[in-house]
Amino acid sequence: MRMTLAVAIVAASLWAGGAQLHAHHAFAAEFDVNRPLTLKGTLVKWEMVNPHSWFHVDIKDKDGKVSTWMIEGGSPNQLIRMGVTKTTVPVGTELVIEGYQAKDGTQKAVGRNFVLADGKRLFLGGSAGGVSDPSKAK
């Protein structure tokens, strides 16, 4: 009886944890592939945290009002391996963000690429559905 209860608890824990991990990494749960966007702004803050990094970017609208968008990127390890670091993209950098907006319409998106002023494109990794590292294209 005791062994059966222990096995049931372990099984339930693994099942619940697995569902949570899957939900966390599901692009479609939070972002809309049918709402691609391109934003131009200034990087004001980095958050190099696991499991996804966050970039805070000030975006000026057509009336000159500034709002801060949160852009999700890949894990710190993934970004560093692709050359996206606090040295290559320091706070204050003007950039263009290509990505997909959050389903809830907030000022949040998953980034696909950063495009720097010199035209250099940096892949952001992350959870964007159907997006892969362009440097590995055949």
Identify the meaning behind each predicted range:
Residues 49-60:
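Short aromatic-glycine-enriched beta-strand elements
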Residues 15-23:
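Sec/Tat signal peptide C-region and signal peptidase I cleavage site
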Residues 22-37:
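Short boundary/loop segments of OB/S1/cold-shock single-stranded nucleic-acid-binding domains
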Residues 81-97:
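Short nucleic-acid-contacting surface segments enriched for D/E, G, S/T with interspersed K/R
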Residues 72-81:
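Short, structured beta-strand/loop micro-motifs enriched in basic residues and often containing a Trp
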Residues 102-126:
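OB-fold/S1-family single-stranded nucleic acid-binding modules
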Residues 5-14:
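Hydrophobic helical h-region of N-terminal Sec-dependent signal peptides
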Residues 41-43, 94:
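Conserved hydrophobic positions within beta-strands
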